[in-house]
Design a protein with these regions (language model features):
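Compositionally biased terminal segments of proteins
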Residues: 1-134
Length: 134
């Protein structure tokens, strides 16, 4: 559910960064990383996807589809722990990615990528197969 103050969007010249500001959903929601000699808690990819799908999965964004496909392909076992949170909006999410508005495809094409460069159709197939298997 969307609540006031639940989402934070930072805008930079290089692009936007969205944060879902909500309590953790998974038991192992974060890892401790060393950043310049300091211990920093960083949410796991599965936690990030769980929050995106649970709190706004009924309003697909290109970035959410991209991130979901990436995590499915790189960390599928970890993502299975998020199953209860992925099911909430699964049907609406699947309908929206399979019958996309032109703006969803355009948004996807505008994503700056580095080492993961899938097509929109590839991400739809990966997300669809995974979500239907739950």
């Amino acid at each position: 559910t969307e609540q006031p103050g639940m989402f934070v969007k930072l805008q930079f010249d290089e692009g936007e960064v969205d944060f879902v500001s909500a309590p953790n959903l998974l038991n192992d929601a974060w890892e401790t990383w060393d950043f310049r000699g300091r211990a920093v808690k960083v949410e796991t990819a599965a936690e990030i996807i769980a929050k995106k799908m649970y709190h706004r999965g009924d309003r697909v964004t290109a970035r959410d589809l991209f991130d979901l496909a990436l995590v499915i392909e790189r960390e599928p076992q970890q993502l299975l722990a998020a199953k209860p949170f992925l099911l909430r909006h699964r049907n609406v999410f699947l309908t929206q990615i399979r019958q996309p508005h032109a703006s969803l495809r355009a948004g996807f094409d505008a994503i700056a990528t580095l080492k993961y460069t899938p097509s929109f159709d590839h991400c739809v197939a990966v997300a669809g197969e995974f979500l239907e298997s739950l």
